[in-house]
């Protein structure tokens, strides 16, 4: 019982202690919120409202002021009283240990303070801006009016430079003057915000007018003086070149100058209407067009120099190429008596001849047009360049064809010499075979030998034809050379096989008496060697038989043969 009482007392003390701590914590937060409320109460909203109220307010400014005052009335009559009630509720809940309810109330107070502070910031900010606006308007209106007066003076002193745009500028200034009067009226009435907007608009408009007044004189100078003078100079240069014999009808200058005058009139209207960007673009484009016409005239002058420098040389080139073409025609006639000239080759000559005739005709027409002054020198220059390029191509093609004709005789002589050389090569090969003292020649080789003779006969027969077809000769010549190469390779292979067979059999004889199988196979190899002259087959049989008895023996025999070592010396 005693211990239970002690435990109960401890629990009571703990609860009371915890309640005290929580209560103290809530009072601390409530005090902080109360201090924040007091600070908000101390903000000088009423003072600022009083300052602005002393100003004479109308229109937009008055409406704004009334909205700010209404907002403050709401804070005074509703928001602050509501705040006081919730503060009292938080204190009561804390006293009664209703900490959860107290926490909710404290949170509501914080939100209410945020709303009040934000609303007061808006009121004070607006009032401050209004007061500053009134002061700033006064300063800027003085500066704006001074700038306006300066613009007025400049129009009076420099108005003659503005030409037909002067009435438009004066109208703009009159409109600005009315705006400034409206500003004064609104200021007197107390509508400072709307007056502020007018000042800003007037300042921007004056900047635009000032920039226009800077640009207009130079644009008018361009349209009234510079561009017309440029066109006059262009026409004078054009007419001077026509008097000197230039053909310039392709430029259609009268039509183009009329068009450019219309462009100038359009640019003047743009300037008068103060569409200055478009006017400046038009001026730049027209200068570029005039420059292009000058470039054309300059090109014609350069082309005239080119034509005078190159007309006679081109005429000389034509005459020389005509002479070359005529000589080539005679050469073709002579060659055709001896050689067959293919139609394709003749077509090449005929094509170049037609090109040459066309170039000659173009040159004659050009010469006539230059003499009559009916062609622009630039066009004449282009035609001369085309003719010169055509002559270069024609010359190269005809030189190539002439070289091919000259090579016919050279190729014929080489073919005849080579046919004789191939006959001598066969005789030499036959003698070499005889020195080898072969048992005989196989049918395959004899057939190749016979075919080789027929190939040379065909070549020699072709060389006796009239007219001589060198393409056919070249074909027979190539076949004969291929046959000779093949025959020579076969002969060398056959003689090589004969020597190797003899060496292999001679080496194998050391086993012949002791090995019947080897002896029988060697007899078979010798039959092929001496009877049907199949030397390659004889070698294969002898090598196979020897390798059965002594592996690697053939390599030793082959090495000894290549080194010219006697078979008897092979170990």
Curated annotation (Swiss-Prot):
A GO biological process held by the record: septin ring assembly
Keywords: Cell cycle, Cell division, Cell membrane, Coiled coil, Membrane, Septation, Transmembrane, Transmembrane helix
Subcellular location: Cell membrane
Residues exposed to the Extracellular side: 1-3
Membrane topology: Single-pass membrane protein
Residue intervals on the Cytoplasmic side: 23-571
Name under which the protein is recorded: Septation ring formation regulator EzrA
Organism: Listeria monocytogenes serotype 4b (strain F2365)
Lineage: Bacteria, Bacillati, Bacillota, Bacilli, Bacillales
């Amino acid at each position: 019982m005693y211990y239970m009482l002690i435990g109960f007392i401890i629990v009571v003390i703990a609860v009371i202690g915890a309640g005290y701590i929580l209560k103290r914590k809530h009072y601390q937060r409530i005090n902080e919120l109360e201090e924040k409320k007091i600070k908000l109460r101390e903000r000088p909203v009423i003072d600022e409202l009083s300052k602005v109220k002393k100003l004479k307010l109308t229109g937009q400014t008055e409406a704004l002021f009334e909205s700010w005052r209404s907002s403050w009335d709401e804070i005074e009559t509703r928001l602050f009283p509501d705040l006081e009630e919730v503060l009292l509720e938080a204190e009561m809940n804390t006293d009664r240990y209703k900490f959860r309810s107290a926490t909710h109330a404290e949170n509501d107070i914080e939100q209410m303070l945020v709303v009040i502070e934000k609303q007061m910031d808006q009121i004070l900010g607006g009032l401050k801006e209004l007061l500053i606006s009134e002061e700033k308007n006064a300063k800027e209106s003085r500066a704006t009016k001074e700038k306006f007066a300066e613009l007025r003076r400049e129009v009076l002193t420099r108005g003659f430079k503005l030409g037909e745009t002067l009435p438009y500028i004066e109208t703009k200034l009159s409109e600005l003057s009315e705006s400034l009067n409206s500003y004064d009226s609104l200021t007197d009435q107390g509508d400072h915000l709307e007056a502020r907007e007018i000042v800003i608009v007037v300042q921007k408009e004056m900047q635009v007018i000032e920039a226009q007044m800077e640009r207009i004189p130079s644009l008018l100078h361009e349209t009234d003086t510079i561009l017309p003078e440029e066109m006059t100079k262009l026409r004078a240069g054009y007419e001077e070149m026509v008097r000197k014999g230039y053909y310039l009808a392709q430029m259609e200058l009268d039509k183009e100058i009329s068009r450019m005058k219309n462009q100038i009139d359009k640019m003047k209207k743009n300037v008068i209407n103060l569409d200055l960007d478009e006017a400046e673009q038009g001026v730049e484009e027209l200068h570029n067009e005039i420059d292009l016409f000058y470039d054309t005239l300059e090109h014609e002058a350069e082309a005239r120099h080119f034509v005078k420098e190159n007309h006679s040389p081109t005429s000389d080139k034509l005459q020389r190429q005509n002479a070359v073409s005529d000589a080539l025609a005679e050469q073709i006639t002579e060659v055709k008596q001896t050689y067959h000239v293919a139609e394709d080759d003749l077509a090449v000559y005929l094509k170049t001849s037609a090109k040459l005739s066309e170039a000659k005709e173009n040159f004659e027409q050009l010469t006539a047009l230059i003499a009559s002054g009916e062609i622009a020198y630039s066009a004449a220059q282009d035609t001369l360049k085309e003719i010169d390029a055509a002559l270069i191509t024609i010359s190269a093609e005809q030189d190539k064809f002439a070289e091919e004709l000259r090579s016919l005789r050279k190729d014929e002589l080489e073919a005849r010499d080579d046919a004789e050389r191939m006959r001598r090569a066969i005789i030499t090969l036959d003698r070499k075979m005889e020195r080898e003292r072969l048992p005989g020649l196989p049918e395959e080789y004899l057939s190749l030998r016979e075919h080789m003779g027929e190939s040379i006969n065909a070549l020699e027969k072709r060389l006796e034809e009239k007219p001589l077809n060198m393409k056919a000769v070249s074909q027979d010549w190539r076949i004969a050379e291929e046959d000779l190469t093949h025959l020579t390779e076969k002969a060398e292979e056959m003689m090589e096989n004969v020597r190797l067979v003899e060496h292999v059999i001679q080496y194998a004889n050391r086993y012949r008496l002791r090995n019947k199988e080897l002896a029988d196979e060697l007899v078979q190899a010798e039959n092929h060697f001496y009877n049907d002259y199949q030397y390659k087959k004889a070698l294969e049989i002898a090598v196979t038989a020897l390798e059965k008895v002594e592996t690697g023996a053939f390599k030793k025999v082959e090495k000894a043969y290549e080194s010219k070592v006697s078979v008897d010396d092979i170990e």
